[in-house]
Design a protein with these regions (language model features):
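Cation-handling catalytic/transport regions enriched in His/Asp/Glu
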Residues: 1-156
């Protein structure tokens, strides 16, 4: 309304605030995905209680100490209901695909007609008629790159 340019320092602070704790959030989501897969790849019933199972499943992934007596599994509905059993990782995978695909638009120009047409032709118009991984490679020209998500989050 004033016509003044927003100072670069304010823009930097806004971006930094958006990315605050992004690394922790990413690891937390990966913990959830790992725990989900651990429950759904059991070869036999766990011998120990839920806390022991979780601690074993997540011991290589935790970045913060576990709060004693708490269990994720008992309140994490995605694991056993809601249609996401053994699929929680798909949230993070979708973020990788989005960030990597959008990176091409950023490289070529957000409104680049050729890039938009390629996205429509190679992905949207095919629906579920071709393996999604093939469609993505056809559009992007390479496998999905998780570094695009890390860059988007300001982590690299």
């Amino acid at each position: 309304r004033t016509g003044e340019v927003i100072p670069k320092s304010l823009i930097t602070r806004i971006v930094n605030a958006k990315n605050y704790l992004a690394g922790y959030y990413q690891v937390r989501q990966l913990d959830f995905g790992e725990l989900d897969m651990a429950w759904h790849t059991l070869k036999a019933k766990p011998k120990d209680d839920t806390l022991d199972f979780e601690n074993a499943a997540l011991e290589d992934y935790r970045v913060l100490p576990h709060f004693p007596g708490t269990a994720i599994s008992t309140s994490f509905g995605h694991i056993f209901s809601g249609g996401y059993s053994a699929g929680y990782y798909s949230y993070k995978w979708a973020e990788v695909l989005e960030a990597d695909a959008f990176a091409l638009f950023q490289e070529k120009g957000i409104f680049d007609r050729e890039t938009a047409e390629s996205f429509r032709r190679e992905i949207l118009s095919k629906g579920d008629s071709v393996d999604p991984a093939v469609l993505y490679r056809n559009f992007r020209g390479h496998e999905p790159d998780s570094q695009a998500l890390m860059k988007k989050l300001g982590l690299v």
